[in-house]
Amino acid sequence: MKRVQMFLAGAFIAVGSLYAQSSDAEWQAGVAKLKETIQTNPAQAAEEAEHLIKGKNKKNVELLVAIGDAYLNADKIPEAQEYAALARKANGKSALASVLEGNIAVKQKNAGLASQKYEEAIYFDPKCTEAYLKYADIYKSANASLAIEKLNQLKDLEPSNTAVDKKLAEIYYLKNDFNKAVEAYANFAMGPTATEEDLVKYAFALFLNHDFDKSLEVANMGLQKNARHAAFNRLAMYNYTCLLYTSDAADD
């Protein structure tokens, strides 16, 4: 009898999980469609958004925030604020709602409020990755040390998250701290998430650190992807020249 009960309980949990996944997929498809309708037919988009949050989804914070994000990305700030307020009403301690509020503040060029909201999101959920990254974005130029401190907190929580390394590399590069920039780039630049710009900056930082062999390797990697890229070609030439010079100097 116990085995039967355990089997039934397991089956019930599995069915519940499948239903939740199906329900999520349904509203996610609705939000994807909404993103297009917002631009082409705002009135219809408003109706679709209201339909999405009917019934059981009325307090679905993830959905409410997704709709708010869709409006915000379309520069519809009042509508984004409306859905941020609904998300906050559904869950007063939602990190997702705080991030949306922070994103709205960024759009309004209110850096102080945005940073406050991202801090709030981290308070509600210390593992809210987006809040750390967005906070660092606000302070990367105005207060790089504060941005780096926040990113290192996230790095402690998520050591293998290359998005953190990418942001750290960007900030160290802006600060002209090329030693630290090289360390950060090394954690992701040779992988699939690196852009051409990342590779150019990595190669240039290595060049400025006089690591000509590695800089040439990175530049050549960039040239394999884009043989006509001016910066990669220049860096390759600079590195060949420096390597030749140091080789000749050693021979003398």
Q: Where are the language model's segments positioned?
A:
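Conserved small/polar residues in nucleotide/adenosyl-binding loops
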Residues: 245-252
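Structural signature of tandem alpha-helical TPR/SEL1-like repeats
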Residues: 41-44, 75-83, 108-117, 142-150, ...
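Conserved structural position within tetratricopeptide repeats
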Residues: 53-55, 85-89, 120-123, 153-156, ...
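N-terminal leader/linker segments that initiate helical-solenoid repeat arrays
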Residues: 8, 18-85, 89
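Position-specific recognition of the canonical hydrophobic site in helix A of tetratricopeptide repeat
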Residues: 38, 72, 99, 106, ...
